[in-house]
């Protein structure tokens, strides 16, 4: 019995052990299967992630390629549009060119017909010049305006001698592009002079010289002006200015009259074919008789006009050339053309100056070089180099041995003419627009873009600075006795200065900023040029408002207005003989005028 119990117990224990082993085996197998499945799932996820990354890279590459192709396509379309636009413009330009060529041919035919009529003794009615004085309403010019008198005299719009528009993109200061310009007359049967020269059919006689008239000097009892405080800096540097002189703005229509004049029906004007003289003194005749002597046609803008010391010749500066005319006849004597410069495009002669003996003509050009020409030989006698910007102004000393130049590089240079070398360099704070020797050659005046006028001795000592203008100073001129200085500015005013450096006053007693004796107002736009008559009686100014005005040193108001150009009056010069003056303009014309006191 006991054995049976033991046997059953043993059998039960064996059964339990087998059952336990079976359970452990099953658990082990289950754990192994789960681990394997997890690994498989992880591998699948990893593979899927890698596939997605690869597809993303492929899509991004395709996107970049698509955007690049789209950009190229847009640029191709834009280029095609630009090409079509250029072709359209070329077609329009060709049509305009053909039309202008037809007009030029027609005008040449009309001109030739008129010449034949004149040669045969038949003068067309429209070519007769009006004479006498006409009393017309102030500010009125008849039916056609001051610059258009008949259909045959309508000017042709040209661009530096070629068809297609008015002169644009010129470096010369204060040149409008809105005014109509006259075409130079060029035919196969004219000489060199007639390409640039034209005179009225009937020329008034040259006025008598001023030698016999009462000499009048600048008064010393003029009311003292009140210039504003001096500019910030008195010292200067040599740093060149970044840009050449450029005058902005436009003048539309005919220039207005001075503000102080009230239009009345009984104020006399003298009206000619294309120029008018207006008295600015109410109810009085013009105090000066002005007559047009010669019209000198050019193929480009005239930047400068200058008389020789004997008054027999007039020099003009224009694009790539300086011209010398006979004042009495108006004929072109010499054409000094710049061909050696390597610079392409426009190359304007900004300033000209005769030597006192009339043998040489100095020219200041945009290529930063000064050429002293032997006029008779038509060759460059001296080439002066050293400026780093364009040259805007030149003047010879009284003895002709020294030349002074002003440049945009902020320097005034004195040159030994015989040696062709720099003698002295004077520095300013900004570009120098105008320079001039005093009549005795002891002082040099210079106007600048920094609104200041500086006076040096001929040895280079700065003795005086004149402050008062509110904008750049573009022109200066000494009085005949050298005691006064006239300045013209872009602030539309002219100022008369009493020079302390020529007086017996000690430098320590100088009034700071200078002594302004008079401020002249009346011009409606920039003052581009001023000059003083040899007897000191008249100040003559040229302006961007297209007028020339006469001023008496005694009065701040203009005495007379001359309208003789249909673009900016860039330069004015008076003859040393005192009986005539010259003007140069953006309308491609220089004119010589006579004047005489009434």
UniProtKB/Swiss-Prot annotation:
GO molecular function, a single term: histone binding
A Pfam cross-reference name: WD40
Example of a GO biological process term: negative regulation of transcription by RNA polymerase II
Cited CDD domains: WD40
Segments of this protein annotated with the region Disordered: 118-177
Domain of life where this protein originates: Eukaryota
Family matches, as Gene3D superfamilies: 1.20.5.340, YVTN repeat-like/Quinoprotein amine dehydrogenase
Gene Ontology cellular-component annotations: chromatin; Cyc8(Ssn6)-Tup1 general repressor complex; cytoplasm; cytosol; nucleus
Ranges occupied by WD repeats: 285-325, 332-371, 374-413, 415-454, 456-495, 510-549, 552-585
UniProt keywords, alphabetically: Repeat, Repressor, Transcription, Transcription regulation, WD repeat
InterPro entries (UniProt xref): G-protein_beta_WD-40_rep, Gprotein_B, Tscrpt_rep_Tup1_N, WD40/YVTN_repeat-like_dom_sf, WD40_repeat_CS, WD40_repeat_dom_sf, WD40_rpt
Family affiliation: Belongs to the WD repeat TUP1 family.
Role this protein plays: Transcriptional repressor.
Name of the protein this chain belongs to: Transcriptional repressor tup12
Upper taxonomic lineage: Eukaryota, Fungi, Dikarya, Ascomycota, Taphrinomycotina
């Amino acid at each position: 019995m006991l054995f049976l119990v033991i046997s059953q117990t043993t059998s039960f224990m064996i059964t339990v052990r087998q059952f336990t082993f079976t359970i452990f085996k099953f658990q082990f197998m289950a754990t192994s299967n789960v681990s394997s499945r997890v690994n498989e799932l992880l591998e699948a996820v990893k593979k899927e992630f890698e596939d997605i990354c690869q597809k993303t890279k492929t899509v991004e590459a395709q996107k970049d390629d698509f955007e690049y192709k789209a950009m190229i396509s847009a640029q191709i379309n834009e280029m095609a549009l630009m090409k079509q636009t250029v072709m359209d413009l070329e077609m329009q330009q060709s049509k305009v060119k053909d039309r202008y060529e037809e007009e030029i041919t027609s005008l040449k035919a009309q001109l030739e017909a008129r010449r034949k009529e004149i040669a045969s003794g038949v003068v067309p009615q429209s070519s007769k010049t009006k004479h006498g004085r006409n009393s017309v309403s102030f500010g009125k010019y008849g039916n056609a305006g001051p610059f258009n008198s008949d259909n045959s005299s309508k000017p042709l719009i040209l661009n530096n001698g070629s068809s297609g528009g008015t002169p644009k993109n010129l470096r010369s200061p204060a040149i409008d592009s809105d005014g109509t310009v006259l075409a130079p007359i060029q035919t196969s049967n004219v000489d060199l002079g007639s390409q640039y020269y034209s005179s009225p059919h009937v020329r008034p006689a040259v006025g008598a010289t001023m030698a016999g008239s009462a000499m009048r000097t600048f008064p010393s009892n003029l009311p003292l002006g009140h210039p504003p405080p001096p500019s910030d800096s008195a010292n200067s540097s040599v740093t060149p200015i970044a840009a050449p002189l450029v005058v902005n703005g436009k003048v539309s229509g005919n220039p207005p009259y001075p503000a102080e004049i009230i239009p009345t029906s009984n104020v006399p004007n003298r009206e000619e074919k294309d120029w008018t003289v207006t008295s600015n003194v109410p109810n009085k005749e013009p105090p000066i008789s002005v007559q047009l002597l010669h019209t000198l046609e050019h193929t480009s803008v005239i930047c400068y006009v200058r008389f020789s010391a004997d008054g027999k010749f007039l020099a003009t500066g224009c694009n790539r050339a300086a011209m010398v005319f006979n004042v009495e006849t108006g004929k072109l004597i010499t054409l000094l053309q710049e061909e050696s410069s390597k610079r392409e495009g426009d190359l304007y002669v900004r300033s000209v100056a005769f030597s006192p003996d009339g043998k040489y003509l100095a020219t200041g050009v945009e290529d930063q070089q000064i050429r002293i020409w032997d006029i008779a030989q038509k060759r460059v006698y001296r080439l002066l180099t050293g400026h780093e910007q364009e040259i805007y102004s030149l003047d010879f000393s009284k003895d002709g041995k020294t030349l002074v130049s002003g440049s945009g590089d902020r320097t005034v240079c004195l040159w030994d003419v015989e040696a062709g070398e720099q003698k002295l360099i004077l520095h300013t704070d900004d570009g120098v627009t105008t320079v001039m020797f005093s009549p005795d050659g002891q002082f040099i005046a210079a106007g600048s873009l920094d609104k200041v006028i500086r006076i040096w001795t001929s040895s280079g000592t700065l003795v005086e600075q004149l402050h008062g203008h509110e904008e750049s100073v573009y022109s200066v001129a000494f009085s005949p006795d050298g005691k006064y200085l006239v300045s013209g500015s872009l602030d539309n005013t002219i100022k008369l200065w009493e020079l302390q450096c020529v007086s017996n006053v000690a430098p320590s007693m100088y009034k700071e900023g200078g002594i302004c004796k008079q401020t002249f107002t009346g011009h409606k736009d920039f003052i581009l040029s001023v000059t003083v008559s040899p007897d000191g009686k008249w100040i003559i100014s040229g302006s961007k408002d297209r007028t020339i005005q006469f001023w008496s040193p005694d009065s701040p108001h203009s005495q007379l207005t001359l309208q003789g150009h249909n673009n900016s009056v860039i330069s004015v010069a008076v003859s040393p003989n005192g009986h005539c003056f010259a003007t140069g303009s953006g309308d491609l014309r220089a004119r010589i005028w006579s004047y005489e006191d009434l």
